[in-house]
């Protein structure tokens, strides 16, 4: 028995297919989904969605959004996403260095919107790197 998985971003249908298992990065921690899962709506954090099909794992970098789980169907609506195998790791590593450099310019206890944006950029780059390695 498989789960029907759809990952949708505003400008693209990122992934549509079956999976034996899905692991989602929710804002409260990872959620593992198997066929017959209880119904649930959750906020998705910046992170990596993992799906298993035919004993092989695939990763998708997610940039925040929402997910709806209904028994054997998972629909993920995100701001943006990238299939791990399509990510240029060098670009992701360069983005991580740039974001970390931007953070280092702020005092440690500062909570400005610019610093929060830089912290988000670090999270996005880390998610892209992690997804590209799986």
Curated annotation (Swiss-Prot):
Keywords of this entry:
ATP synthesis, CF(1), Hydrogen ion transport, Ion transport, Membrane, Thylakoid, Transport
Q: Which domain of life is it from?
A: Bacteria
Where mainly located? Answer: membrane
Cellular component terms per the entry's GO annotation: plasma membrane-derived thylakoid membrane; proton-transporting ATP synthase complex
Location comes to:
Cellular thylakoid membrane
Q: Name one Pfam family in it.
A: ATP-synt_DE_N
Q: Which membrane topology term applies here?
A: Peripheral membrane protein
CDD domains assigned to the protein according to its UniProt record, in alphabetical order: F1-ATPase_delta (cd12152)
Q: Name one GO molecular function term.
A: proton-transporting ATP synthase activity, rotational mechanism
Q: Which family does it belong to?
A: Belongs to the ATPase epsilon chain family.
Q: How does it assemble?
A: F-type ATPases have 2 components, CF(1) - the catalytic core - and CF(0) - the membrane proton channel. CF(1) has five subunits: alpha(3), beta(3), gamma(1), delta(1), epsilon(1). CF(0) has three main subunits: a, b and c.
User: Its biological function?
Assistant: Produces ATP from ADP in the presence of a proton gradient across the membrane.
Protein name per the record: ATP synthase epsilon chain
- Organism this protein belongs to: Prochlorococcus marinus subsp. pastoris (strain CCMP1986 / NIES-2087 / MED4)
